């Protein structure tokens, strides 16, 4: 029988960075984090300040940007601290806290992608009824439901993880406290934890993904009924950004969790985890903004209005 012990901290050894390269990686990750933070913050601020962006699509986009901002902060701030201090560790309480917020904002972004897909479906397939269907009340209710579901989901998994017992091994082969890695260290029975992960995984990941696929299948079906260059261009212009983000989000998750290698959280696993915790949130503002005329015009309006309001 394994000897159980009280674990006060975990070592995060998912990114074995040589000491001579510590500062280089610190600068790289800091730039990536600041790009993520400022890019997503800009979208949130623009949607709040510009009345032209007070639409369902940009309401969901601003919430997605806020979610991405927080999602990246959950892992990156601790990673930067560990690289700078050269002590890659996290306390037991800090680990559970990180798991809670990681799940909360990760799955919140997942549901927001579903809402945005539904918004595009209604806009393209039912343009005359769009305002009535995508009412402010419906959007607010959806956001409230998303927050409640993801908070409950994150709290359930965190509480289940808190009841686990651990042996002497406190090494987590990742750069943050990942629930899957934590379960591998547990000495106590993890059947309930794994069962709930699979059950909730279907509800939180699989069902939303299916809903997104159905939404776009209906959009494509609607366009094919009246094929024209203008309608096809409209679909790509309104859905291209969203499809890119969906592909990034689900592509990395499928590659990491559904198609694992022999050692799921080896260096390869940590690199893939870096993709969806850091790279995807960093790219989202560029994907949604660079070719988005509304966002560019909003930035110009907000910037010009601030200049005009200055006393000099």
UniProtKB/Swiss-Prot annotation:
Covalent S-S links between cysteines: 95-187
Tissues in which the UniProt entry reports expression: Olfactory epithelium.
Subcellular location: Cell membrane
Annotated organism of origin: Rattus norvegicus (Rat)
Record GO terms (molecular function): G protein-coupled receptor activity; olfactory receptor activity
Keywords assigned by UniProt, alphabetized: Cell membrane, Disulfide bond, G-protein coupled receptor, Glycoprotein, Membrane, Olfaction, Receptor, Sensory transduction, Transducer, Transmembrane, Transmembrane helix
Role according to the record: Odorant receptor.
Primary localisation category: membrane
The protein's name in its UniProt record: Olfactory receptor 1493
GO biological process, one term: signal transduction
Transmembrane helix recorded as keyword: yes
Transmembrane among keywords: yes
GO cellular component: plasma membrane
Similarity section: Belongs to the G-protein coupled receptor 1 family.
Residues on Extracellular side: 1-23, 78-98, 157-194, 259-270
Glycosylated residue positions: 3
Membrane topology: Multi-pass membrane protein
Residues in the Cytoplasmic compartment per record: 49-55, 119-137, 218-234, 291-312
Entry-linked InterPro entries: GPCR_Rhodpsn (IPR000276), GPCR_Rhodpsn_7TM (IPR017452), Olfact_rcpt (IPR000725)
Domain of life of the organism encoding this protein: Eukaryota
Pfam families reported in the protein's UniProt record: 7tm_4
Segments crossing the lipid bilayer: 24-48, 56-77, 99-118, 138-156, 195-217, 235-258, 271-290
